[in-house]
Amino acid sequence: MNSKHIDLLDFSELPSAVYFRYADFNAHEYAAPHRHPWGTLEYAAHGVLHMDVDGSRFMSPPQYAVWVPPQVEHSFYSHQPVNYRAVCLDPKVCTDLPLRACTLAISDILKAILKDFAARDVKIPELDADQRLAQVLVDQLQQAPVHECYLPYASSPGLLAILETLQAEPGNNQPLAHWALQVHVSERTLARQFARELGMSFGEWRQRLRYLAAIEALETSRSVQEIAFDLGYSSGSAFIAMFARQAGCTPEQYRRSHLEGRKV
């Protein structure tokens, strides 16, 4: 399948201390590995970000954004359509932000400012009111809870093979005991490995994977029931309950808000 290259910003330094970028990427668009002297908050208002940042993989749903510090190499790929928003920050503005790439929880205030700026196509805050909002946004970023990664990956070959199989088949319902047999360890040992390397249980990791897969599936015309069965749920109601716990809304509500967001 052919992929389309995403154009990068064509200047060597930012035209303002805080600069905003907005785009709607279609499925199978990518930005090749690159780096720049400013820091960037990479955010998908709808869809899922797939990024490689300094050799680490990041996938983030709309409640989170990926923070890329200045001079850190990163690339981007969209498996499905993504409503993309980026906040580019001059290095002087980055001093109170993490030194390493990470995932930041996005507050409702930050979402609202980004939505407002995107609706008005504000790239450089020039009005006094917009400059104040931009400062509030920076303050929100500095206070945002830091997470290593929404869907972390393993370093050990055995565990990584399990994760990659599950990512290729998010509807796979095989229990932890099955995967323990595949890598020739006990179920208890594998459970400890999940906790040690990923910071979460097997069940939590698989649920997060399915949530990300659901967000991408909702970009298609498939029904909620079809998506539920594809992701291994025995009923639509079980899938809806999982999605609502993660997103704070039902799949249909998310889909409707996506259609509205694409109009922005």
Residue ranges and their predicted role:
Residues N2-H5, A241-V264:
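…primarily DNA-binding HTH/wHTH and HhH modules…
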Residues C94-Q167:
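Amphipathic alpha-helical segments enriched in hydrophobic/aromatic residues interleaved with Lys/Arg
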Residues A177, R196-I240, R256-V264:
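Terminal helix-turn-helix DNA-binding modules in bacterial transcription factors
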Residues M1-V48, K263:
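Generic protein-terminus/edge-of-domain signal
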Residues Q63, L190, F194, A238-F239, ...:
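Short hydrophobic/aromatic patch on the recognition helix
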Residues G55-P70:
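Short acidic-glycine-tyrosine-enriched beta hairpin
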